[in-house]
């Protein structure tokens, strides 16, 4: 029987921070779950403004996706992150926002984009981040409102067709990430096509625009690795349907990326402090493929 990454993550956390943990997998305080033990007020406000009550509950989990994202990106203003994309374009990002609210449907609750990076050239990178959420199971479920074309800012009929084409009778697996991907893509499409005003900070013009699904891939020795592969397959199936229905704006470039891919870039940054690299490695990447 294969090992569980959840068990190894929890065991390593207890070894380091046992006195700071309320049980096997949760800290008393989110500060025990971040590099340096302190979060700037500007970032605290971003997380507290989201809908997930992130800093009070979710961020205290050893397996917190939001704190994984925070630890990997909060520093880019001081140490800009340069990514060479698959289309060979190189982009440097030096601004970050967490839990950015973006309108999806008319008169409904906005989506919270996990991470948004940008730079002075108005290049924007939207990130949907996943740690180990895909090891859970749930059915594909979107509000009935998504079947009403009039509720969309644009392409309501096409979106409704795509959503209805997804087989809700498939075996129970992790579908929430696919639902979030759809909601976020609708929001980004609204933004690119100028259908919504998302409020001053991000919408100042558009340069290079990308949307990545950034997912943590466990080592193959872990039983959860098969769930990662299944989730990646569902993502690929969704993107085939997106292309079939002509729903991805031509200005938007989309990719599936793992934290291991990102780590190869981050660990080779000469100016990034070694203690930060060591933290990312020991807390996360030693468990990754």
Give the predicted meaning of each segment.
Residues 1-289:
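Charged, terminal alpha-helix-loop-beta segments
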């Amino acid at each position: 029987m294969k090992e569980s990454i959840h068990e190894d993550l929890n065991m390593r956390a207890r070894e380091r921070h046992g006195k700071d943990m309320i049980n096997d997998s949760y800290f008393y305080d989110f500060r025990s779950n971040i590099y340096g033990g302190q979060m700037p007020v500007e970032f605290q406000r971003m997380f507290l403004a989201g809908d997930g009550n992130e800093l009070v509950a979710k961020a205290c989990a050893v397996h917190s996706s939001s704190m994984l994202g925070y630890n990997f990106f909060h520093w880019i203003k001081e140490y800009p992150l340069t990514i060479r994309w698959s289309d060979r374009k190189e982009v440097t990002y030096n601004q970050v926002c967490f839990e950015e609210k973006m309108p999806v449907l008319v008169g409904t609750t906005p989506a919270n984009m996990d991470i948004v990076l940008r730079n002075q050239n108005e290049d924007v990178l939207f990130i949907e981040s996943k740690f180990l959420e895909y090891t859970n199971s749930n059915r594909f479920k979107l509000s009935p409102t998504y079947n009403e074309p009039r509720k969309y800012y644009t392409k309501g009929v096409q979106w409704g067709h795509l959503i209805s084409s997804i087989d809700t009778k498939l075996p129970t697996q992790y579908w929430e990430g696919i639902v979030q991907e759809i909601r976020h893509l609708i929001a980004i499409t609204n933004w690119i096509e100028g259908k919504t005003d998302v409020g001053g900070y991000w919408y100042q013009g558009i340069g290079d625009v990308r949307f990545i699904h950034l997912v943590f891939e466990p080592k193959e020795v872990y039983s959860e690795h098969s769930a990662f592969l299944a989730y990646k397959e569902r993502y690929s199936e969704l993107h085939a349907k997106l292309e079939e229905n002509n729903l991805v704006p031509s200005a938007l470039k989309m990719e599936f990326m793992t934290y291991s891919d990102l780590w190869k870039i981050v660990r080779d940054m000469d100016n990034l402090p070694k203690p930060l690299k060591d933290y990312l490695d020991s807390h996360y990447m030693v468990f990754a493929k």
